Amino acid sequence: MAPKAFFVCLPWVLPRHALIVRQAGNPYHFLAYTNPRAPGKLQDSHCPVFFMGIIIITIITVTLAIIIINIIFLTLFDDGMCFYCSLLTFSFVSFNFDHFDHFDL
């Protein structure tokens, strides 16, 4: 198994001793971890690795949501970006001061 496997270490995502193993001819990636009692041996956790796909899908979804929200606010309000930024930073005071000219005082 070891000569046919391709190992990629992801220490920032996976816990200690964890590796992603891809066997030759196998399209699926499986999570395996090194056995501290037997160095060089891999112990399969029998768990397909879906978390990388979930992370990528989450990043794409959040990015698209931010773009869509920006487009909506820019089309509904004349200075939509300022309004959207004030929503993000919760600086409603500066938003209100900037928009006094819209009201008849």
UniProtKB/Swiss-Prot annotation:
Assigned keywords, A-Z: Membrane, Transmembrane, Transmembrane helix
Topology feature Cytoplasmic, residues: 70
Additional detail: Present with 521 molecules/cell in log phase SD medium.
Location relative to the cell: Membrane
Membrane topology: Multi-pass membrane protein
Parts of the chain that traverse the membrane: 49-69, 71-91
Descriptive protein name: Uncharacterized membrane protein YIL054W
Gene Ontology cellular-component terms listed: membrane
Record keyword Membrane present: yes
Extracellular side of membrane: 1-48, 92-105
